């Protein structure tokens, strides 16, 4: 029979073991092996049975065992030491505090940052993630904690998390959703001074009110606030708003995003008030899902500070950072405009929004405008609400500038103000203990941030590096066999049929991993383009390859499920099933062993559709060699010695032809380059050339792929400038914000009437030479703006056959006087910087000291 209701009863700990509660509820244990070892020592078998979950362990352990441990001097000594270490970690000055103590930086660094994401992959015990976006967000929090960055994170608590994947007998993906009891997770409920749960409220249409309680997950030093709508105060339908991640229709999705954005800001206000913390100065949107946070902050400033909409928008923009993770328009949340209007529009007949009281509904809707007038674009809203934006690799930054060029019409894609911060991964989470121990021996500490530590790997005997790689491969093979057996049993097989699994996979065979989400562009089945060729590689008598595949398809994506089924059916064939497997239910625990044990990490997306691709970074962090299309981070950091590049047929329009070409290149690389190097051994059985690639990979990529590097980049290039801008706009009763908002209004009104009436060039000899002096003079009608309100630039560069400027350089032109009819004269003299076919033009841009860049407003007039 089934229980009517499920809940979790936590164990009562003996007083002497009270520190176990703090150690179990701060998720720092998930990346601190000594703490994990302490919990394992309580009951090793139960630790495995509980899936390495300290809260579950403490709830299930025999009370007599706890009483025994309360008298165990050795255990108590370890407990006290780890509790003291955690308290020291939470309070001691770290990198961020050292920067503040340095003096100059202290005035630039924000006092607090709010980080919003719809998913967070912090640890297996909190399955609030579906893929790379969530894992990246989790690594961001953990690295921010390790660096001492004062971050508060905000997301949603999904009662069913993300689905558990299994396979049917014929290889079709089947989804089941767990029921997660927050009382049984490392969470605490945010309560007020009276001990009552703090609730946030958001007014929806038809007089409905969505309420949510706030669970707090402590991620080291970083609190993660998770909003939960499954409370009695909500009507039945609204209780389901946070039921599952990516599980509903668009109506469900927009309600989640409204709660995450608007409710998330209100949750931060409640949390900082309860904890008596300084409110964050900078707000970071990890994708456009939480874009409504910017509108809620505008509402606060309009309601509480009495600002007009434009001035409030100016303050919000100055302190907001937007990160885009998608390289294709199809990856952007776009809602029907009619749906958005239902939530934000006039509910009372005065043109004001009920969702965001005090704000004109038409201004809210305009923030999400795009080319299709029937759509509301969340990424466009995010970009309009943020003064600073970035992609997640150098290549993705370029792709994003082209994709969002329409918001800065008149500018070349290279000039679109979207930068890049290449993603990184959290080493203590993803590096195998053997590598971390070697790092401690080389560095004398746990710090892996400095490149010099990685360079010390040259001291290590190749045989030792190979021993680590072989040990990790053996661990992976054991795990694969266990998972393979479980999967076959779930699909209806019996133990009597599964004797072959005991010898499936071989700890001495070249092991290739491919594990990720299964959208079409990642091309899960590229490896199957020529099944016979793949079979030859798997079964080669001298140089065999074994392949481990994993990944989840979105529940609504039957196309992705069909790709998985193709792989499963191939892997089920008796002649190859000992060399290739599809492992269901890809999650953090499986991923970790794959990154540790795979010799080669395969990635074959359609270029340039991979924004970053951090799975390959995690493999590199463990000495795995990447075999990848030059996309995402690999385009940036591949150097010819840290793996292999799969040639991409970028110019081929026929998709089938392109897949055939790239699959053929993949097979050739495996057969002719990868496998020979792996199996070439010296007299000690060590593949010297392979190990040197492993060493080179660790030395060159190790310090680059770290999330600590990524978070430092955000702090220095995005958070600190945003905090400085916020202090200027919010200081002195918002006078600077009012001035900038007024300037923007004047500029936008004048811009359609600005005219470059004439451009004159003088000074060049009859045959211009490189370095010859060119004088440009422009006559400009400013339509009421002052000369110091604009920047006039000469733009010079090589020209193609259509007279399009290539790689232009800009030269600022000085105001030299006023001509007839009120026209302003601007002039400059500059040496010709290039040889060959050269052209020039002149343009006018806005100028204001508080703009992050002259192209920020998207206004430009060309001659």
UniProtKB/Swiss-Prot annotation:
Name of a matching Pfam family: Phosphorylase
According to the record, the segments passing through the membrane are: none
What's one GO BP annotation on this UniProt entry?
glycogen metabolic process
Per the record, residues carrying N6-(pyridoxal phosphate)lysine are 618
Q: Which domain of life is it from?
A: Bacteria
Indicate whether Transferase appears among the record's keywords: yes
User: Which InterPro entries does UniProt cross-reference here?
Assistant: Agluc_phsphrylas (IPR011834), Glyco_trans_35 (IPR000811), Glycogen/Maltodextrin_Phosph (IPR052182), Glycogen_phosphorylase_DUF3417 (IPR024517), Pyridoxal_P_attach_site (IPR035090)
* Catalysed transformations (reactions): [(1->4)-alpha-D-glucosyl](n) + phosphate = [(1->4)-alpha-D-glucosyl](n-1) + alpha-D-glucose 1-phosphate
Q: What is its EC number?
A: 2.4.1.1
Q: Which SUPFAM superfamilies match?
A: UDP-Glycosyltransferase/glycogen phosphorylase
Can you provide one Gene Ontology molecular function annotated for this UniProt record?
Answer: glycogen phosphorylase activity
Q: Which UniProt keywords apply?
A: Allosteric enzyme, Carbohydrate metabolism, Glycogen metabolism, Glycosyltransferase, Pyridoxal phosphate, Transferase
As cofactor, the record names: pyridoxal 5'-phosphate
Functional note: Phosphorylase is an important allosteric enzyme in carbohydrate metabolism. Enzymes from different sources differ in their regulatory mechanisms and in their natural substrates. However, all known phosphorylases share catalytic and structural properties.
Q: Which family does it belong to?
A: Belongs to the glycogen phosphorylase family.
Sorted alphabetically, which NCBIfam families does this protein's record hold? more_P_ylases
| Name the record gives this protein | Glycogen phosphorylase
């Amino acid at each position: 029979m089934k229980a009517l209701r499920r809940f979790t009863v936590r164990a009562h700990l003996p007083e002497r073991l009270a520190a176990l509660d703090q150690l179990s509820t701060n998720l720092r244990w998930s990346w601190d092996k000594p703490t994990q070892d302490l919990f394992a020592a309580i009951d090793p078998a139960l630790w495995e049975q509980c899936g390495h979950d300290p809260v579950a362990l403490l709830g299930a352990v025999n009370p007599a065992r706890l009483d025994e441990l309360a008298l165990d001097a050795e255990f108590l000594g370890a407990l006290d030491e780890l509790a003291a270490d955690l308290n020291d970690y939470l309070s001691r000055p770290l990198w961020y505090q050292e920067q503040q103590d340095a003096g100059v930086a202290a005035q630039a660094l924000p006092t607090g940052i709010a980080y919003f994401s719809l998913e967070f992959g912090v640890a297996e015990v909190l399955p609030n993630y579906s893929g790379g976006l969530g894992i990246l967000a989790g690594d961001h929090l953990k690295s921010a904690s390790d660096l001492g960055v004062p971050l508060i994170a905000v997301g949603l608590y999904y009662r069913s998390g993300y689905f558990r994947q299994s396979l049917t007998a014929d290889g079709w993906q089947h989804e089941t959703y767990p029921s997660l009891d927050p009382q049984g997770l490392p969470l605490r409920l945010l309560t007020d001074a009276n001990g009552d749960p703090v609730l946030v409220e958001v007014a929806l249409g038809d007089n409905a009110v969505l309420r949510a309680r706030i669970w707090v997950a402590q991620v080291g030093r970083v609190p993660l606030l998770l909003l939960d709508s499954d409370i009695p105060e909500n009507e039945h339908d609204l209780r389901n708003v946070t039921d599952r991640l990516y599980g509903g229709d668009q109506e469900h999705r927009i309600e989640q995003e409204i709660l995450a954005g608007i409710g998330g800001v209100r949750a931060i206000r409640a949390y900082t008030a309860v904890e008596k913390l300084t409110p964050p100065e900078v707000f970071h949107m990890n994708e456009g899902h939480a874009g409504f946070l910017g509108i809620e902050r505008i509402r606060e400033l309009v309601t509480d500070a009495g600002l007009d909409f434009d001035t409030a928008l100016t303050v919000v923009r100055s302190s907001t950072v937007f990160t885009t993770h998608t390289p294709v328009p199809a990856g952007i949340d776009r809602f029907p405009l009619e749906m958005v209007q239902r939530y934000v529009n006039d509910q009372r007949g005065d043109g004001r929004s009920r969702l965001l009281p005090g704000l004109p509904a038409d201004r809210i809707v305009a923030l999400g405008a795009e080319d299709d007038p029937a759509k509301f674009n969340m990424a466009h809203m995010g970009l309009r609400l943020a003064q600073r934006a970035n992609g997640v690799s150098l290549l993705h930054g370029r792709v994003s500038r082209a994709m969002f060029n329409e918001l800065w019409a008149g500018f070349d894609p290279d000039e679109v103000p979207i930068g890049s911060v290449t993603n990184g991964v959290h080493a203590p989470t993803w590096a195998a203990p053997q590598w971390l121990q070697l790092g401690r021996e080389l560095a004398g500490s746990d710090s892996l941030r400095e490149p010099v530590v990685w360079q010390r790997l040259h001291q290590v005997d190749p045989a030792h590096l190979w021993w680590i790689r072989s040990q990790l491969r053996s661990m992976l093979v054991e795990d694969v066999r266990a998972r393979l057996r479980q999967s076959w049993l779930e699909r209806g097989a019996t133990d009597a049929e599964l004797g072959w699994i005991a010898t499936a996979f071989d700890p001495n065979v070249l092991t290739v991993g491919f594990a990720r989400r299964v959208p079409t562009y990642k091309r899960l089945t590229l490896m199957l383009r020529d099944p016979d060729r793949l079979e030859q590689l798997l079964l080669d008598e001298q140089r065999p390859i074994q392949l481990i595949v994993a990944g989840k398809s979105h529940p609504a994506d039957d196309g992705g499920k069909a790709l998985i089924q193709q792989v499963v059916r191939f892997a089920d064939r008796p002649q190859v099933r000992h060399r290739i497997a599809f492992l269901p239910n890809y999650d953090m625990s499986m991923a970790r062993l794959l990154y540790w044990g795979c010799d080669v990490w395969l990635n074959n997306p359609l270029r340039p559709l991979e924004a970053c691709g951090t799975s390959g970074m995690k493999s590199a962090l463990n000495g795995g060699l990447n075999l990848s299309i030059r996309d995402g981070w690999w385009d940036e950091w591949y150097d010819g010695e840290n793996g292999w590049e799969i040639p991409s047929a970028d110019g081929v329009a026929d998709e089938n032809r392109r897949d055939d070409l790239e699959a053929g290149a993949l097979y050739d690389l495996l057969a002719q380059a990868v496998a020979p190097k792996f199996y070439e051994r010296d007299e000690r059985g060590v593949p010297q050339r392979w190990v040197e690639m492993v060493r080179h990979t660790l030395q060159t990529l190790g310090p680059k792929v770290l999330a600590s590097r990524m978070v430092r980049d955000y702090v220095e290039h995005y958070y600190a400038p945003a905090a400085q801008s916020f202090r200027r706009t919010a200081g002195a009763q918002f006078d600077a914000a009012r001035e900038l908002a007024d300037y923007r209004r004047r500029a936008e009104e004048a811009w359609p009437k600005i005219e470059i009436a004439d451009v004159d060039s003088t000074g060049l000899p009859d045959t211009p030479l490189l370095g010859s002096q060119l004088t440009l003079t422009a006559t400009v009608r400013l339509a009421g703006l002052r000369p110091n309100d604009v920047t006039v630039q000469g733009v010079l560069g090589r020209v193609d056959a259509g007279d399009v400027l290539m790689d232009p350089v800009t030269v600022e032109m000085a105001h030299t006087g006023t001509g007839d009819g009120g026209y302003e004269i601007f002039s400059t003299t500059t040496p010709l910087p290039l040889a060959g076919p050269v052209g020039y033009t002149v343009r006018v841009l806005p100028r204001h000291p508080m703009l992050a860049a002259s192209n920020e407003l998207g206004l430009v007039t060309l001659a």
